[in-house]
Amino acid sequence: MFITVQSETCNTPVLPIKNGFVPANLNHNCNLLLRDSYFTPKSAKTQKIRTARELVEEFLEVGVAQRQLSPKTAQQYRNQLYTFLDLWLLDDLKELDRENAELFRELLYQMPKNPNKDKRLHGYKGIALLNRNEELGGDVISRRTVKKFINLLSTFFGWLKSRGHVDENPFYKLKVRKALSNDRRYQLSNSDLTLIFTMRDYQSRNFLHPYYYWLPLLLRFTGARLNELCQLYKSDIIIVNGVWGIRICAKSNGQRLKNDNSMRFVPLHHALISRGFLKFVESCSNERLFGELPLVNGYYSHNASKWFARRRKTLGLDKGKDAHSFRHSFVDELKQKGVAIDIIQELVGHSSNSTTTSVYSRSYKPEILVSAINKLDDSHVAAIKPYAM
């Protein structure tokens, strides 16, 4: 099939293009359109040799451009990948095999925790940094952090392999030691929940910002991630088949999701409705529910996370119990109350491990989801009065 097109960048008629392929935007250099094919065969391409750091930057740029990474996450990944390069030293990443990957994993167990915050470690890199931290008897990163580091490297090398920069992914399915109990995030106990919801501000009904009142309650009764709640718009509070709930999505400005499975509908627990959540939503003058929370490094949860960390310290909650602990408690409580695991997965935005469930089934009806949500115990919030507008 042949077509003739006219270029917008010159007056010369363009010769027919083979296979009927015409670029969507004709504002190209005429020479491109005069060729027989818009594509360049692989054998005709010249591979530019990039340094390891250039490949890291390209990997991060692609992630940000495709909205897979926020600027904040990209910077965290940059720091980790540069830490890896400081240890590897060689510029040719093709030289890294499985044995070297295993060696790097062992070195990670000796990696100092927050080296930038310890002035005694400033100026040290690579092996010298590890040795200096050992001399000082400094803390090392947790096994959970090691696992995340290895997962990042596996993603990076998978990306390199898909683009022909390396021949193998030496970090693929590389096992790490199981996390120690003190490395894990903990669930919130009944006594923890009682402490949180009997804070003085809940008793006095004196809140500096609306999110001081609503975020702990929403975390408790939705199982959502902190940023998913901080980024909510009024238009995200919807009614489906007579059931009020929260639409967690990334449709509006500044919203982001962890992954595709995160998009979901979470019904409102009766404890939220009875305390005036719908009236609060209606009263918001801002399109966002918590307009007082600014976007910081791609996340609306920045200030709220710091606020809850201060609250945790004031309450004397154990290390490892943070805003994300509500999510762990949500999952465990519904599981203990006999709610089917695939219903729980749908409520929290986790993918199903079952091919049958993930491929052939549709979402649960709202009335089934709200029935599960309302199994959550609300005795801890019994003394909390409705929100005063």
List PLM regions with ranges.
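Conserved tyrosine-mediated DNA breakage-rejoining catalytic core shared by Y-recombinases
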Residues: Q231-R275
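N-terminal helical hairpins
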Residues: M1-E54, E58-R67, T73, L121-G123
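Active-site/catalytic core of tyrosine-dependent DNA strand-transfer enzymes
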Residues: L193, S252, P267-D318
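Non-catalytic DNA-binding core/recognition domains of DNA-processing enzymes
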Residues: Q68-L87, K94-W159, L174
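Catalytic-site neighborhood detector that most strongly recognizes the C-terminal catalytic loop/helix
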Residues: S252, L295-V296, V348-V381
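Basic, Lys/Arg- and aromatic-enriched nucleic-acid-binding interface segment
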Residues: N133-N151, V166, K173-L226, C230, ...
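Short, polar N-cap/turn motifs at the start of nucleic acid-interacting alpha helices
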Residues: I237-V240, D318-K319, V339-S361, A382-M389
